[in-house]
Regions:
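Bacterial N-terminal signal peptides
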Residues: 8-17
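A short, Gly/Thr-enriched small/hydrophobic beta-strand-prone motif that recurs across taxa
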Residues: 26-53, 59, 64, 71-78, ...
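Short, compositionally biased
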Residues: 294, 349-553
Length: 553
């Protein structure tokens, strides 16, 4: 076996560059008068933990998951990557860093780097002699990190050794590993040392199955979301990462994908139903697979859809931890768009997953997709509502949540008194109002989220062929505050962008043709109220004017 070795004991934080060949020792970092003794090191890789998959059938119109998500156990710059490795590649060892800590004082006594060039699992290394009982750590496939751990460093600090990574693989495209031998004495153990290594990353595998016969599902994106950036080399993380410490891994959108990722101790809760594993019910930093695409049921219309699959222990719906040296195998059979499964998101999201909510949503009727959704557990844009205008008579705090159980159409216009604005309004288990566009090219509707028969909140839906961000012109206006009055002293000049038409209008063109003029009216609002009323249905009147007809069913 050919082994390239670099020895390092550090007293100063000076970076020394070593240039060595096979079997050549670098001597620039060795502390004088430290005696070493040869030791034969044997390594093995502990298999990744996995479990028997559990099948959870959801029916023909749902997401059927066969989960192999089980808890198991076993930054300086390191690496993590997507792409399946063979078993041999997952076990391969490209290089090692050896760190020797004295048990008496818990300080680093010696470190060494060796490059294993022929794939063998044995190496002739050196350790400091005269140390007595010690603990020897071996890091594999992480490059030479001996320069990162100074001589005399505390073992407690070494155990926190970590790096930010951009994928899950280390040097030589092999997986980062760690192992240790406690209570080792090189002078009493026949100069032989055996260390079992476990991978410092988890493996996430997705196998995607085609839909029911006659249905079609076109995948547009498969991503692994909320992946921890920080890879802990030695010991597991004790806390969940922050939002800033998370990233996203992409894929080639094929039906068989593998990622290697750092562990993520996102936590657990009391969930017992797998259909409740969705955004509002899980830890904010939990890792999940997001599958997006267009689903077309047999004889139906294509709809944008997303499926969210959170990782965690396969036999515990409330577990969301991703742990090192563990396989998470997800066999996902896409079988429909069941809105009673919280992991299924039907329609294009108008509210950016609840981060950009509003009281009015505008959709383009010329888009191929006809299904939309918006978060309905937040009132409007989530702003605080003063008691003076609150429908409850009390202050509604900012981002105060509501808990609907169903949704319904309040009213809608119909183009030519026939073509409906909306074909469907419903409520999904994960807190979204879902609606499908009707045949009307221009229209308005009000939909409500309810708890049984009680309306909790309502929203205006404006559907138009003109809303392509080009068809509706925008004019910028500038305010001119008055001068000389105390009440206007703190008012500054502002700019506002205004559309060329009223909200809900089918046209912005001035005309004297009655039929076309009516299209410019849009909807009416009573001062202080957020929901619109249908506008006039005639251009001229003598007494009372007819309004545009509206329908509630």
């Amino acid at each position: 076996m050919k082994v390239t070795k670099f020895f390092g004991l550090w007293i100063l934080s000076v970076l020394c560059v070593l240039s060595c060949t096979d079997e050549e020792q670098g001597t620039g970092n060795i502390v004088p008068n430290v005696a070493t003794a040869p030791v034969k090191l044997s390594l093995d890789a502990t298999p990744m933990r996995g479990t028997v998959s559990t099948t959870r059938t959801r029916g023909d119109n749902s997401l059927d998951l066969v989960l192999g998500e089980e808890a198991g156990k076993t930054v300086n710059t390191a690496g993590t990557r997507a792409g399946t490795l063979t078993d041999a590649q997952e076990d391969a060892i490209n290089d090692i860093c050896v760190f020797q800590f004295g048990n008496a004082d818990g300080k680093l006594k010696y470190s060494e780097y060796a490059s294993l060039t022929d794939g063998q699992l044995t190496a002739n290394i050196s350790l400091a002699s005269g140390v007595g009982t010690c603990t020897v750590y071996v890091l594999a496939n992480v490059g030479d990190l001996t320069q990162k751990v100074s001589y005399g460093s505390a073992l407690a600090d070494f155990k926190k050794f970590a790096a930010e990574v951009s994928s899950g693989k280390g040097t030589g495209q092999n997986l980062p590993m760690c192992g240790y031998k406690a209570d080792f004495n090189s002078e009493a153990d026949n100069a032989s040392l055996t260390v079992s290594l476990t991978r410092a990353v988890a493996k996430v595998s997705l196998n995607l199955t085609t839909p029911n016969a006659g249905d079609a599902f076109a995948v547009t994106s498969v991503r692994l979301m909320n992946v921890a950036k920080k890879l802990y080399y030695v010991e597991s993380a004790t806390t969940a990462p922050t939002v800033a410490e998370l990233t996203t891994y992409t894929s080639d959108n094929t039906k068989s994908i593998a990622w290697y990722v750092p562990e993520n101790k996102a936590g657990s809760n009391s969930l017992t139903d797998w259909k409740d594993r969705y955004e509002d019910n899980v830890p904010a930093t939990a890792t999940y697979i997001l599958i997006e695409g267009s689903y077309t049921p047999k004889g139906g219309i294509a709809r944008d859809v997303a499926y969210t699959i959170y990782l965690g222990a396969g036999d515990k719906a409330g577990d969301f931890n991703v742990v090192r040296n563990t396989k998470y195998t997800i066999n996902a059979a896409i079988k429909g768009t069941n809105m009673n499964d919280g992991r299924v998101l039907v329609g294009k999201d108008l509210s950016a997953a609840g981060t950009q909510t509003a009281n009015c949503y505008v959709v383009n009727t010329t888009d191929a997709n006809k299904w939309y959704r918006f978060k309905a557990t937040i009132r409007g844009n989530g702003a605080e509502t003063p008691a003076q205008i609150s429908y409850t008579g009390a202050v509604i705090p900012a981002n105060d949540r509501i808990a609907p159980t169903n949704a319904a159409l309040v009213w809608e216009t119909r183009e030519g008194d026939k073509a409906p604005t909306l074909d469907y309004v419903g409520y999904s288990r994960n807190g979204y109002v879902v609606f499908k566009l009707g045949e009307a090219t221009e229209g308005n509707a009000v939909v409500a989220a309810k708890n049984g028969a009680t309306t909790l909140w309502s929203w205006h839906i404006w559907t138009t062929a003109a809303f392509d961000r080009n068809g509706i012109k925008v004019q910028t206006y500038e305010t001119r505050p008055r001068n000389g009055l105390a009440s206007y002293a703190n008012i500054t000049k502002r700019e506002f962008k205004m559309m060329d038409r009223n909200l809900g209008s089918a046209s912005g063109t001035a005309t004297k043709v009655a039929e076309e003029a009516i299209k410019t009216y849009g909807v009416y609002f009573q001062f202080g109220r957020k929901d619109p009323f249908p506008a006039a249905g005639v251009m001229t009147r003598t007494n009372d004017a007819d309004i545009v007809p509206v329908y509630d069913a």
